[in-house]
């Protein structure tokens, strides 16, 4: 497949009107690179684990970070801004992750989508963790869905790729969704340069799309198994996984996420730092490619903090659990 065919395949996968591929280190960088969030716009985001990316990437834009992914928090922070769905703007942007932020929060995208349209806001969803397999964010109310393709490419992409998908604007009974129409017009007019992929890169992405459902189900299933193991581990506290009833968004997640509850688990260590745990683990837990088959750990609050975020691979969860257990007890 060439780039256009891959973009069309991704649009079909994401239920989108159109999709674009671009190179970017992560989703906020891709949104900035598009240039559709302009000086004079207001960008309201729930991204407490990615605040620096929003502080640096949107010069001239009024950026406000909210402490909750609720529609009420976004609406309150948007009061007084005279937003428009006209292409000229000014535009009000709402940004959330389908799974993200500290605690792996799952926002009610349906409620956010409704509230965004009432406020004349454009809802953008970072769908990287849940993926198009695990969350149909455009159907739920987003006008733009952005997804870093590390996991889609099974960790084999030679550079960081992001897919940008725009919602269909045709609603039932021939009504037009003004928010989606505005987002499409902005994407069409952003002047994004023609994107090129090498034959190897195109092959990696094509094979990734072909095997996506099977692999993502394996990631989700292993995450649940590891979450249940960690929930019973006496060396761990404050486990956060949307699939457990203890998670604050569990009820919402059952209606937002599909095929499970995503590949990520977050937890805090008792009486030791994340760096100390990494010292006791094989290097592959830290250095394996993002989105690949090997379970990977990260430190969202730094190595001196106690918070660990686990992204389940497709490797044997019994072996992963045994390795973690040994490191936690030594």
Segments predicted by a language model, with ranges:
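N-terminal "arm"/small-domain region of PLP-dependent enzymes with the aminotransferase-like
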Residues: 1-16, 306-315
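Conserved PLP-enzyme active-site core in the AAT-like
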Residues: 5-235, 246, 327
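Conserved C-terminal alpha-helix-loop-beta "cap" of PLP-dependent enzymes
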Residues: 235-326
